[in-house]
Amino acid sequence: MTDVEDIVAKIKGIFLNPVETFQESRDDPQGMIITYFAVILLVNSLLHTIVIYLQAGSYMGGLSPTGPGGVFFIFVFAVLSSLVMSALFVLWLHLWVYILGGRKGLIQTAKAFVYGATPEFLLGWIPYIGIIFLIWSFLLGVLGVRELHEISTARAAVALVIAIVIPLLLLLFVSLYLISHLNTIPAAAYTP
């Protein structure tokens, strides 16, 4: 099979038969994972860019402030930020998987994340219902960690929950701190 056929088959498997697909993915080479992730990342970034561009125009009465250069910037930012955040999340997730008994290696954690994130990356860009695909990807992530690290569903779920909740709590506390300090900044004196 070609790379395209492999990727389409993997996507179909993740959507229709995820447990079997994860089990068959244990020996996937790193090149396959990288190619697969690159494809879903580029599709996700392109579709997010289109949605952001269209929504920006609707908020501005049809006048989009982004222009052609802005569209390119949004796309590049989406690709780079998704790439960096995904890599950091895989490392962070692997720490918790390891603590909870997963000993099959970082590559298996990367596979669980990449393949599990398929619904979010391919369909999460859809306004208003994207959250459904985020939840679906979370559940697939649990299955992926369970199957690829051969640990219990409970341990896999706890690893994912911890890996998600701690950064969210940190973000919340930082946001609250910044908001509370913005209220203490004196306003500039108004002089007509």
Identify the residue ranges that each predicted region occupies.
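Selected alpha-helical membrane-embedding segments in polytopic membrane proteins
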Residues: 2-100
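Hydrophobic alpha-helical transmembrane segments and adjacent short intramembrane/lumenal linkers
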Residues: 90-170
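Perimembrane helix-loop junctions in membrane proteins
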Residues: 24-27, 52-60, 98-105, 144-151, ...
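A sequence-composition feature that detects small, non-aromatic residues
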Residues: 9, 38, 56, 78, ...
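Weak global preference for isoleucine
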Residues: 7, 11-14, 33-34, 40, ...
